[in-house]
Amino acid sequence: YFYHNTAECDFNMGREKRNYWHRYSTYRTDAGDVDLFLIAGPSIRDIIERYTDLTGKSVMLPKAALGYLGSSMYYPELPENSDDAVLEFIDTTHEEDIPVDGFQLSSGYCAVETEQGIKRCTFTWNNKRFKDPADWFAQMVKRGIIVSPNIKPGMLLVHPLLEEMKAKDMFLPASDDNAGVDGLAVGTWWGGPGLFVDFTKQSTREHWKQYIKDALLRYGCRSLWNDNCEYDSMVDKDAKVYFEGKGSTIGTMKPVMSNLMCQLSNEAIEEYDPNCRPFSVCRSGHAGIQRYAQVWAGDNLTHWDTLKYNIATILGMALCGVSNHGC
């Protein structure tokens, strides 16, 4: 069964027992219609093939996506010279004959000074940690590394670009029953309250791609890590969503935002460098996310137990059509 609906929902897979009838399953959704697809087999492989006929096949990623992609919050969080520390890490892997093809750059690179202290602010650079982003990207490319900087769809209320983005009408409006801030919906975010970008509006999508180009691609970046895009911290589930002029709520459209964010990352890279094959990484997504990104399952520990859990997670995601998955 494929229940095609983007609103928050609940599955009861036989967990309730009654004396009057046999175990049963239920599906409930908060809003919208349900397109229910019954996908015939007979084999699991046949079902997955037909499911991806509906939702889309996996995006063709660059070869680097198949290799070891290093990642650590430690290096970008250093008080200074994070750029040198990452280069030293890559050099060490080469010296130890550990093949590495990419590096996921966590959000410490954009943690800048604000009126409330150091805060993560997407589309900015901490120049104490990364002195010359263009030179650093060039050094990483020279070492054969594709870098995926972390970007987030939420902007703290102390973000230096917040007023500029508000003037461009990029954020979700608050619901009628919630005043928000200047009429905009406020959610909890890394470091405090923030506003969330509405990717269902064409003008916002164009502005977002331009920010990507100006803050990252012009320095040599050709891959993006789309993070924290679940919109789960948007407590006001009735916050308004533009939805191409038709109007909706974030409670109904939440998973669509992840897919759109990844689609925009790919479009921005393709527009900036038509000869480049985009590589997007994402932590969440709706059915069809495989068309745009490689998905990861969130933070884990460097431990053998994690590896055991990862195998089950990767296989489970593949059964959902997401073959390009890493943990």
Q: Language-model features: where?
A:
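Catalytic-domain carbohydrate-binding cleft regions of carbohydrate-active enzymes
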Residues: 1-327
